Amino acid sequence: STQRLTYQQVDRFLKGHTKDIKPEVMPLLNDMNKLARIIEKRRDRQGMLHLDLPETELVFDEAGRVVDGQPADNSYPHTIIEMFMVEANEAVATVLDSNNIPVMRRVHPEPDTFTLRNLAELVRSLGLSLPRLPDRASLQQLLGAVKGTDSSLAINLVVLRSMEKAQYSPLHIGHYALASELYGHFTSPIRRYADLLVHRALDCYLRGNLEAGHDWMPDNQQLADIGRHITFTEERAADSERELKTVLILQMLADKVGQDMDCVVTGLTNFGIFVQSRKLGIEGLVQLADLGPDQWQYNPKH
């Protein structure tokens, strides 16, 4: 390659700082930026949902202990890569589907009516506009309306929790959040088995080796079994990562009990309030007994 770059280097270049970039790379980066924005606008028109949920990057000391947390970089070069990946994933899934080749899809079912009605009721109780049975376009408008406001994190979290979980399956369900009818994971075969399956299917297609029973060409039933397994292992890995991250942060906070923390309310129950740290991204429960001497009454609708 001509030059290896970080997201931060590309971001600085796109903002006018050209010092670290080789001249022959500059036109390519500018073209990538322009193309990504064109793709993003088209996908916005199609109804793609952009959830704004900042990730926390842990800061470690020399001994390997967590000493702080900071917002992970989310500059536009990340979106450039995301747009290109989504295009590649969709293009490959479309080619395989149009040739009737069984393929492992990344599917994201539409939210159920009951959940959407509850979401609308909650959002409307906060003074925000949303139809009683919101569609994807109205959810997109809601997320755009709260972007950059104090309520952004809370609204993005409740929208996320109203969504079904994405999964791996050969079924033709589509991907709701991406507004894509044909979608499969293709761009990360070194870390996801689903991508490797799609690479194998594409390899068979390009070689014209499509006879039934080929080791690299599982049928739909085999794909369904594999899909259930890798969906389970994906969720297990995500849960393990989340739990480890929480434990490391709690170890850091052990000597900070009693200090104030900037949080957002993420849920209410009859026994307390769930809050999430804006900086660290972990969630905890504030029990009613800890809220002071006032009288509190839980109203599930408000």
Briefly describe each language-model feature range:
Residues S1-H302:
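Conserved, carboxylate-rich catalytic/transport cores that coordinate ions
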